[in-house]
Amino acid sequence: MDALELLLNRRSQPRLKAPAPQGDALKNIMQAAMRAPDHASLAPWRFIVCEELGLNKLGSIFEQSAIENDKSEKEIERAPQLPLRAPMVIVAIAQYKEHEKVPRVEQIASASCAVMAMQLAAVAQGFNGIWRTGAYAHCELVKAALELSSDDEIVGFLYLGTPAFEIPDKPAPNSDAHFTFWR
């Protein structure tokens, strides 16, 4: 798959199964994150790769968050199962670093670009994934359990694995509605 085909046809895959990327495939995914746009070479990101028992640990953190935040019984019951929807979840964190020329929003954007690069690298190697956020990405209890600082921000949970089925074709949105040209 060439790069342009990958970019024009990328789709999230919510149904994932084992195996997850391992060995060189995982190393390529990790290295792709390092090529994200990065003003002043701050590397304002950190990643936690959860697999096997790590998925259960992340699920326990979600469950505790649901309990502490007075979620419904159904949400509390569902919380520990969320990370088990894929054989691997990469927690992507924007790790803010004070810099006079690189504001917080730019560092969050950089970490977000790293997530996109990882998903594209996964797809290029025959895997796929879905970038999820939700309440747990913005929960102080989750941040504390992951030992993040108050300045850190979870930009998402990248679920990775082998596609459980082929995603049906869907036309891409028309780009014309989103671009204005000044000439």
Give the residues covered by each predicted segment:
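N-terminal amphipathic, basic helical "cap/leader" segment at the start of enzyme domains
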Residues: 1-85, 183
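Small-aliphatic-rich amphipathic alpha-helix that forms the alpha element of a beta-alpha
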Residues: 33, 90, 96-144
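Short, well-ordered beta-strand micro-motif
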Residues: 49-51, 91, 159
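Short, electropositive alpha-helical surface patch
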Residues: 142-153
